[in-house]
Amino acid sequence: MVTKPNGNWRMCVDYRNINSACPKDTYPLPNIDRLVDGAVDHKIMSFLDAYSGYNQISMHPRDKEKTAFMTADANYYYEVMSFDLKNAGATYQRLMDKIFKGLIGRAVEVYVDDIVMKSDSFEQHLNDLDEVFKALKGVNMKLNPEKCTFGVEGGKFLGFIFTHRGIKANPEKCQAILNMRSPNSVKEVQQLLGRLTALSRFVPRLAERTRPMVQLLRKGKIFAWDDRCEEIFKRFKEFLASPAVIQKPRPDHLILVYLAVSEEAVSAALVQETEGKERSVYFVS
């Protein structure tokens, strides 16, 4: 049993054996950047969360016994889908795509169990909500009112923060790096690089700046966190204390690409001009 952030309990089952034997469902998940760009920059939004969403999908009768697990009192199996199963995410996404067919892209963006609604007016948002509720009712999908937010100007979606100014990095991800001490092992460097990579859209010249840290991961190399690595680490912390706000790309605006090329890395900054000012859209390296 694992404690949830709200204090409730979540039961987890070790399905590593059945997952390793189960063929992978190759149903494609949406591109996160496209979903984020499609959802931001709307006047009114709602964020929806299904009530134990995975458990609202029934298991196929012949597969129920495959989910069996033992307790001190008896053996049990799942009547509904467990989130621990290998193809649970793909199955959930397939269902969402069917439920919201015709709404995705126009009024809704969905990534597995993350759902955001977007509208350009309050009246339109009411109409969109009506369509979404009818679609959910049609398959008897229930929402969790405690985790839903309606009629707001911004919020968090897929680890990004939507505001009237544009797209912000998740403060929790930034704070996780700010709270880190200087790495003392290869594992801690890997953890730092993983967290920086998760924020790569907001960080210019990431590959070039992290190269001294990446070199510490080479096999056979003696670990030595030197002054150069420490200085880079401090600069990342200074930057992430107040990260840049980026905007969604606008198809009717010219995209400018600025390249930074060195012997060690190639980086690019995508910008567009808005109201006479160049605004960052994306950093790639």
What are these regions (language model features)?
Residues M1-S285:
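Retroelement reverse transcriptase polymerase core
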